Amino acid sequence: METMLAARLHVPSRTLRVEEVPRPQPGPGEVLVKVEAAGVCLSDVHLIDGTLKPFLLRGDTVTLGHEVSGTIAEVGEGVTIRTPGQRVVLYAGELRDGVTYTRGVDYDGGWAEYALSAATAMAPLPDSIPFDQGAIIPDAVSTPWGAITETAAVRPAEAAGVWGVGGLGVHAVQVLRAVGACPIVAVDPNPVARERALAAGADIALDPADPGLREAVAAVTGGAGLAAAFDFAGVPAVREQAVSVLAPKGRLVLVGLTDQPLTLTDGTRFSYLQQRVLGHYGSDMPVALPKLLRLVQAGRLDFSGSISGTLPLGRAAEAVARLEKKEGDPIRLILRP
């Protein structure tokens, strides 16, 4: 039996270990992908600390990693749309019997030398896009894309705000710029993140502790407020602040994960202004991923600055710790088997 290395999370004990496991074999309709790059995401941190739980996992241990790119090593019976050697980026999840299963959460992901996938749950990766940049698109980019284009349905010239300009938020700024949002307001307590937001295309970057934040948002929006606000931080105080600068009929989209209660201090004002709170998770992979790959290939979006470091698979725990502690203010760390 052939084996491989994989970073496995034992969910009950929250223990992450790099182990030698059997190399999977592709069944009918499946392909085996030799992993070239796998992103490390805050969702992985949340899985390890217990904030995020795998509700559909069979068993108690899972190979992490939902941001994965590589080359096809083998194809299973009946697969005609993929060929060995083809460069691909995997969807962050698969639809099974009408239910979406998340890769690296509900079934084994890509923190491994090889990853198994349905042949339909991937997209060709153009030669012009490096594996590391391609790997992060299925979550770090497509999640903001879905939040902006689908959940909030942002239109050109609408004012938008992004709270938390980290691994997803900085890409939200880029996507908002691409879809024509104007102005774009970035909010983050970290001065490095604020500078990063301005470089990504934000019109103004503010500290949430600034007592003049509401006045600054009013000034940049001509007194109208934000048509759409995005919480990528998952912090209750962020939501209160974002609602306070929403325009009438404005949308607050919750992207950052938290187990804290959702509270609106002034419910009467919220209802009177016909504002909305919308939850968001993931994206429509078959629709979003090809579009994003085209935008990157055409130079409309550029994620070369999003790769903050690359580590070998054996140092997966170190990568998680660096992201959790925000050492060096990383956007995305990449594991390479």
Q: For the regions a protein language model found, what residue spans apply to each?
A:
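C-terminal hydrophobic helical "lid"/dimerization subdomain
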Residues: M1-M4, E240-V243, L289-P337
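Glycine-rich beta-strand-centered segment in the early N-terminal region that forms part
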Residues: P22-A38, L52-E94, P126-I129
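Residue-level marker of beta-strand positions
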Residues: E67-S69, Q86-R87, Y114, A159, ...
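Mid-domain Rossmann-like dinucleotide-binding core that forms the NAD(H)/NADP(H) cofactor-binding site
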Residues: R87, D127-D210, E215
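Cysteine-cluster motifs in flexible loop/terminal segments that predominantly coordinate metals
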Residues: Y91-T120
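Glycine-rich phosphate-binding loop and adjacent beta-alpha segment
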Residues: D203, V235-L301, P337
